[in-house]
Amino acid sequence: MARGPKKHLKRVAAPKHWMLDKLTGVFAPRPSTGPHKLRECLPLIIFLRNRLKYALTGDEVKKICMQRFIKIDGKVRVDVTYPAGFMDVISIEKTGEHFRLVYDTKGRFAVHRITAEEAKYKLCKVRKITVGTKGIPHLVTHDARTIRYPDPVIKVNDTVRIDLGSGKITSFIKFDTGNVCMVIGGANLGRVGVITNRERHPGSFDVVHVKDASGNSFATRISNIFVIGNGNKPWISLPRGKGIRLTIAEERDKRLAAKQSSG
């Protein structure tokens, strides 16, 4: 009989987007409980060791973290398996580097460097709005923040911009047609485009149609849509490729062109 939470994670059962090879060990780091789900997060150890190559082993990552060099969303994190997720800002004081976790078009977390100015805020999707004890309204975001007394105009699926120093909402974007969004789940994960229309299906999932910058259209569930800007101006910088997914033939041509120019 299972007693309590699972403490291990086998390498073959780890999320594919962590990109761990299955032959270098049996186990993968199991993320701690935190603001992001196991299959939608990137543990700090994988980011520092496998992505940035700042350490060779887990022990080295631990030594880096225990010196309190790593901040996530402005807070020092010493847990090597802390689950960092979509839109989180990772800052390394010692090197003066800042990263934002956003998806590339293949659905993996890109190592996306940002400026110190951009590292002061993050965008959060509003998951639900409730009225708590004594009639205090509050909203819950995709990264498990609870913010009391929000602007009554803000509704579910809107995006709020949060100042990481104070934790307060500075502005917000309505979920509306014509706004630019990023897909954060499903087969189109990581694609960026403008919302063209929303099909309402009472009792089921609403479907949202999106058109990307190169004119390709696709549809996904409303729960997979994260609005990132007003009109076609995103409020955050995007990783290389700007969220436009290429076809296999286009990728091949791009590779060949790069090979010829370097050769």
From Swiss-Prot:
Q: Which residues cross the membrane?
A: none
InterPro entries in the cross-refs:
KOW, Rib_uL2_dom2, Ribosomal_eS4, Ribosomal_eS4_C, Ribosomal_eS4_central_region, Ribosomal_eS4_central_sf, Ribosomal_eS4_KOW, Ribosomal_eS4_N
Q: Which CDD domains match?
A: KOW_RPS4, S4
Q: Which Pfam families match?
A: 40S_S4_C, KOW, Ribosomal_S4e, RS4NT
Q: Which UniProt keywords apply?
A: Ribonucleoprotein, Ribosomal protein, RNA-binding, rRNA-binding
Sequence similarity:
Belongs to the eukaryotic ribosomal protein eS4 family.
Q: What is this protein called?
A: Small ribosomal subunit protein eS4, Y isoform 1
Q: Which organism is it from?
A: Macaca fuscata fuscata
